[in-house]
Amino acid sequence: MRIGAYQFAVSNSINHNYEVIKKAIIRASADGIKLLVFPECALTGYPPRDIESSSVVDFQKLDKVYDQLQDLINENEIHVIIGTIFRKDNEYYNSAIILKPNQDKQFYHKKALWGWDRDNFCVGSESGIFEIDGCKVGVRICFEVRFPEFFRELYMDRTNINIILFYDVADIDDEERYDLIKAHIRTRAVENITHTLTVDTISPYQTAPTALYDKSGYPLIELKRNEEGLLVYDLDDFELDFGEKGRVEVSDWVTEKVV
């Protein structure tokens, strides 16, 4: 399956973000991409960096944008995962919307909340596991990368690839944080023996990679930091090598003992 990730400077304008996402979808479809992912809160902006709070989002406009995106996805026969904000009654969630050709939209709501997230959002409860073009895909959002437990849930369900949407930036060029987040991602890939695709916004300074790591945590492709761009990769290596088989066997043994 050809997969893609698009990094860009997320803004406070739903219309602007939609136009960037629309162009990226059309470009990705022309490149034969079947699954395209975008950063955390890519449609709405992230509170309070881009918008004052989750409650100021124009949800009527957002619903119209979802409909426009669904038409675009039907036309281009592509699966898309986009960061957004979800409202249910008076509760708001930091969410990923999963859009598939000619199917109902699905959501994953972020569980690990702290700081600005806790100020603006409620804790989600969904598994974050979706079937996309014959693959079992796990979805997690930003801060969750720091907790192996959230990824062990995905391992237990034998996901083929895990996706992490980030809005992780700094006001200074913090390469140390970038490397730290990258280390977390590589560890999650290794310990769960699962390809891991990540995507981040780019402004002011990007502090998480837009990249793909293999089942042993090795980087397969990584975009240049702080520049808008499209990552493209043909992912077809789901067979386990000798070391990966060992990690699966021991992981399953340890999990049985814990459970």
Per-region residue spans from a language model:
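Cys-nucleophile CN-hydrolase/nitrilase-fold catalytic domain and related Cys-dependent amidase chemistry
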Residues: I14, K23-P101, A170-V190
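Active-site catalytic loop in hydrolytic enzyme cores
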Residues: R87-D157, D174-A183, E239-K257
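Extreme N-terminal starter segment of soluble prokaryotic enzymes
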Residues: M1-G4
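C-terminal beta-strand edge segments of enzyme domains
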Residues: I129, T201-V259
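Residue-level detector of high-confidence beta-strand sites
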Residues: S95, K105-K110, I164, E222-L223, ...
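Short polar catalytic/cofactor-binding loops
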Residues: Q7-S13
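Structural motif
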Residues: K34-L35, V137, I161
